């Protein structure tokens, strides 16, 4: 079912309104054909954008995805938009030279990471590359040079950041065009609603991407007092709208005037359908606030 692609910014990439996240793919225990079938099912629903990072699965997920994608016909591969991230260096078997987890936003690392992602994913271009986390040692001019080199080489079309504060975003945006800030946001993590993150993006007409829209599942199954309060509100509103509680959680995000683009992290196609159902629901202010309170 084709879904209209949506722009993250005036000159930004066009992504599906819900993005499929591959973060946990290494834990799914699937062979390449099963991974390909998941990609196909996502695309059949109109979800053609996939969110990655070099570090996912201990530096293994991009290669798992690429192995599956290599089995796909070109007609499918050409429909997909691939997002990846770089800038975190984990202690991992695949990176024995890393003594501690740290950040690296040097031009050399950004370029090398993007090129490694392209090889692992078996694609020629990333639609969007994000700096994964703020780096206290980030030289904004150096990052801008790396972005321009990757853009000029045709290896990355657009650039953004993830988990940046408004001041950090403003600094890097003063040197190079940014098209999104991918942040954590849900009814249990509401800081971006008050710390200026969403206000800044709305002012710039740049849409945020949202990771962990269901709080890692806590919005549906968490046992804490706050989790249960939100679950009860979601259930009441879902009953009124005749949909799943997860659908209301996504609709709560989509109601925001900054027009977020959520990343669904589930391997379950039914969970993706529930996220997509939110595109047909507009919560009124009372419903939205009922989840907030």
Regions found by a protein language model. Name each.
Residues 1-81:
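N-terminal binding-site loop/beta-alpha segment at the start of enzyme catalytic domains
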Residues 9-14, 44, 68-81, 118-122, ...:
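Acidic (Asp/Glu)-rich catalytic clusters
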Residues 29-42, 105-121, 165-169:
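Short, acidic/polar
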Residues 30-37, 60, 64, 98-109, ...:
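Alpha-helix N-cap and loop-to-helix initiation/capping positions
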Residues 47, 123-126, 156, 178:
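A structural motif
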Residues 118-137:
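Active-site groove signature of glycoside hydrolases
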């Amino acid at each position: 079912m084709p879904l209209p692609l949506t722009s993250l910014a005036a000159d930004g990439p066009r992504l599906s309104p819900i993005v499929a996240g591959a973060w946990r793919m290494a834990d799914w225990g699937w062979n390449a054909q099963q991974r390909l079938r998941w990609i196909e099912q996502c695309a059949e629903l109109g979800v053609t954008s996939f969110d990655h990072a070099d570090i996912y699965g201990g530096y293994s997920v991009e290669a798992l995805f690429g192995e599956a994608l290599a089995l796909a016909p070109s007609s499918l591969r050409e429909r997909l938009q691939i997002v990846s991230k770089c800038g975190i260096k984990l202690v991992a078997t695949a990176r024995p030279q890393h003594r501690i987890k740290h950040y690296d936003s040097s031009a050399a690392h950004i370029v090398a990471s993007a090129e490694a992602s392209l090889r692992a994913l078996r694609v020629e271009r990333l639609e969007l590359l994000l700096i994964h986390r703020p780096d206290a040692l980030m030289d904004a001019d150096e990052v801008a040079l790396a972005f321009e080199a990757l853009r000029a080489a045709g290896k990355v079309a657009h650039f953004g950041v993830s988990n940046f504060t408004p001041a950090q975003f403003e600094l890097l945006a003063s040197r190079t065009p940014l098209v999104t800030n991918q942040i954590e946001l849900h009814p249990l993590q509401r800081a971006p609603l008050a710390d200026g993150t969403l206000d800044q993006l709305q002012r710039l007409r740049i849409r945020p991407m949202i990771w962990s829209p269901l709080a890692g599942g806590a919005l549906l199954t968490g046992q804490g007092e706050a989790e249960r309060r939100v679950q009860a509100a979601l259930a009441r509103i879902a009953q009124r709208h005749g949909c799943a509680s997860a659908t209301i959680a996504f609709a709560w995000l989509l109601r925001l005037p900054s027009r977020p683009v959520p990343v669904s992290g589930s391997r379950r196609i039914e969970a993706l359908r529930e996220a997509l159902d939110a595109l047909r629901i507009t919560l009124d202010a009372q419903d939205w606030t009922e989840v907030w309170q």
